[in-house]
């Protein structure tokens, strides 16, 4: 009811900040359809911003995919810039063509705390993300029985653009943090030049549908010490 965009506040998901015996707090995330058991990267950044507003000053927490920590880099004009440590990525699976979808789909599968399929395309701005994303999410036999979020990626000079169809929301969202991480790791593995590279770390700037985010990681064993950075702002109470 809270997530309903007609009769509630309107949101892609609901997060609960709960007490933890091990860390500063625990984050429980639920999609707008009530499903849970996965990590939400942008939700994690928003949870840290919320925790800070509640007076919490240290941000080690537990989520569905394990331990996370975060830093607030800036807090200006009601917008917090949050840097969140994400799960390491130990495996990437490449597919020349998924079986089942009506459109042939070459891409990569990764788990960044949530299951993601990444597909590189041209003309992303006008791409039918919902139709093709839904087709892959429900019909790709390789991703069954659980399915996966589907990310469409287009490199540009200086970074990548990402649009995501999210399962559980069953629509395109303005930005998906775990999907953006998956897209950046896939971009590196596919030879897409990063925005910067220094001391063994690579960094990608990412244009989502609304915000500019960044992902940096060490490209060892696919991706280690992965961090997601972006804005989080208060909307309603």
Stretches found by the model and what they are:
Residues 1-78, 118-237:
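A glycine-rich beta-to-alpha transition motif near the start of alpha/beta enzyme domains, typified by
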Residues 64-66, 87, 99-104, 209-211:
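Short strand-coil-strand connectors
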Residues 90-93, 97-112, 117, 223-237:
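C-terminal domain-closing interface element
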């Amino acid at each position: 009811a809270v997530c309903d965009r007609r009769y509630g506040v309107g949101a892609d998901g609901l997060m609960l900040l709960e007490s933890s015996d091990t860390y500063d707090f625990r984050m429980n995330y639920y999609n707008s359809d009530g499903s849970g058991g996965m990590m939400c990267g942008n939700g994690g950044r928003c949870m840290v911003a919320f925790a800070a507003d509640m007076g919490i000053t240290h941000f080690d927490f537990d989520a569905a995919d394990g331990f996370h920590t975060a830093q607030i880099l800036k807090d200006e004009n009601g917008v917090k810039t949050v840097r969140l440590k994400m799960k390491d990525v130990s495996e990437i699976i490449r597919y020349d063509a998924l079986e089942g979808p009506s459109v042939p789909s070459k891409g990569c599968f990764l788990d960044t705390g949530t299951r993601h399929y990444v597909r590189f395309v041209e003309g992303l701005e006008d791409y039918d993300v919902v139709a093709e994303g839904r087709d892959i999410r429900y019909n790709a036999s390789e991703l069954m029985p659980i399915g996966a979020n589907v990310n469409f990626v287009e490199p540009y000079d200086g970074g990548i653009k990402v649009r995501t169809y999210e399962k559980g929301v069953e629509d395109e969202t303005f930005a998906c943090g775990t999907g953006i991480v998956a897209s950046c790791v896939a971009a590196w593995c596919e030879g897409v030049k990063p925005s910067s590279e220094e001391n063994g770390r690579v960094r990608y700037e990412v244009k989502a549908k609304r915000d500019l985010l960044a992902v940096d990681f060490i490209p060892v064993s696919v991706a280690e010490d992965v961090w997601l950075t972006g804005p989080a702002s208060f909307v309603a109470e």
